């Protein structure tokens, strides 16, 4: 499913087709404690762009491996790998960048916020790990997916167009997930009920490369169709922790793939943070997309 979501993000290049330039932003990747995969439906997060790991084999085999290798279920953050100390206790250590798999194409490259291209995200995070505890390491973040390129400034006129395309894209992603959901658990039952109303509405603007004037008119005419998609995306991003606020880290999975296609991405999210506290609350997020204050409802974040 995560591969399917990556495909949707690629399609966003057309739906969100503005000049292919962007500004520098930040991403901080937190180390995750060892946690096994929970029962969250695969694909519940529409902005995860990494491929999941697939384990084949019977339970007995897995149990034997775990017993022989304590690192089996010890998860480390990006840039680190598990090794055993003298007492056979698993620990996370920085990965040697040279041990990263060789890239197979340009699409694997990433750009850091100091405008340096890395062969892959593995190479970037392994390098960042070696700089832990230094000023340079603290400031170094993954900016966007793809090799570094010239990023033009986002003009005020362009900034006003960004939420028009983004709103339409969010709605279309939800509708697509709904159409592909049969037997795939892409959406929860509550989400399906909400999206069903959008899907069956004959007034819904079909996905396509529409002029911003049409997108603006559609938002005005069919405003109610956009309320849930905006809330839904906030809920997909607000994961670590689930606290009603989006950090730079939580925004990164959405931001990084969009920046090469939408050069106003960084500035848009910066303007959403009205109180400049480095976090975007639900009220700020919804307001950025034109949702009226009386229609902002935490119960819609499902």
From Swiss-Prot:
SMART domains in the record: FOLN, KAZAL
Q: Give the glycosylated residues.
A: 115
Give the Kazal-like domain ranges.
Answer: 88-150
Recall the GO molecular function terms of this protein's record.
calcium ion binding; extracellular matrix binding
Give the record's GO biological process terms.
bone development; cellular response to growth factor stimulus; pigmentation; regulation of cell population proliferation
Subcellular location(s): the record lists: Secreted, Extracellular space, Extracellular matrix, Basement membrane
- Which PROSITE patterns is this protein grouped with? EF_HAND_1, KAZAL_2, OSTEONECTIN_1, OSTEONECTIN_2
Domain of life assignment? Eukaryota
User: Which stretches are transmembrane?
Assistant: none
Locate the residues binding Ca(2+): 273, 275, 277, 279, 284
Q: Which cysteines are joined by disulfide bonds?
A: 71-82, 76-92, 94-129, 100-122, 111-148, 154-264, 272-288
**Domain Follistatin-like, which positions?**
70-92
The residues the entry assigns to the signal sequence are 1-17
What protein family does this chain belong to? Belongs to the SPARC family.
- Report the protein's function: Appears to regulate cell growth through interactions with the extracellular matrix and cytokines. Binds calcium and copper, several types of collagen, albumin, thrombospondin, PDGF and cell membranes. There are two calcium binding sites; an acidic domain that binds 5 to 8 Ca(2+) with a low affinity and an EF-hand loop that binds a Ca(2+) ion with a high affinity.
Q: What is this protein called?
A: SPARC
Q: Which organism is it from?
A: Mus musculus (Mouse)
Q: Which gene encodes it?
A: Sparc
């Amino acid at each position: 499913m995560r591969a399917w979501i990556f495909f949707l993000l690629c399609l966003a290049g057309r739906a969100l087709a503005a000049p292919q330039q962007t500004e520098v932003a930040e991403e901080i990747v937190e180390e995750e404690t060892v946690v096994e995969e929970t029962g969250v439906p695969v694909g519940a997060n529409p902005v995860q762009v990494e491929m999941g790991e697939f384990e084949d084999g019977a339970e007995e085999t897995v149990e034997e491996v775990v017993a022989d290798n304590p690192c089996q279920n010890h998860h480390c953050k990006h840039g680190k790998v598990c090794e055993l100390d003298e007492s056979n206790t698993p620990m996370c250590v920085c990965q040697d960048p040279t041990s990263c798999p060789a890239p197979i194409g340009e699409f694997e490259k990433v750009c850091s916020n100091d405008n340096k291209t890395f062969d892959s995200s593995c190479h970037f995070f392994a390098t960042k790990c070696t700089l832990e505890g230094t000023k340079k390491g603290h400031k170094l973040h993954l900016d966007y997916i793809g090799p570094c390129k010239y990023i033009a400034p986002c003009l005020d006129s362009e900034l006003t167009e960004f939420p028009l395309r983004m709103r339409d894209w969010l709605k279309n992603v939800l509708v697509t997930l709904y159409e592909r959901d049969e037997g795939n658990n892409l959406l929860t039952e509550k989400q399906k009920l909400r999206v069903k109303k959008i899907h069956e509405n004959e007034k819904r603007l079909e996905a396509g490369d529409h002029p911003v004037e049409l997108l603006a008119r559609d938002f005005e005419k069919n405003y109610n169709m956009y309320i849930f998609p905006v809330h839904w995306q906030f809920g997909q991003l607000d994961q670590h922790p689930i606290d009603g606020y989006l950090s730079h880290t939580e925004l990164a999975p959405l931001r990084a793939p969009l920046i090469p296609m939408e050069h106003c991405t960084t500035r848009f999210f910066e303007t959403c943070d009205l109180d400049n506290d480095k976090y975007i609350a639900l009220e700020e997020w919804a307001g950025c997309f034109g949702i009226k204050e009386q229609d902002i409802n935490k119960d819609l974040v499902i």
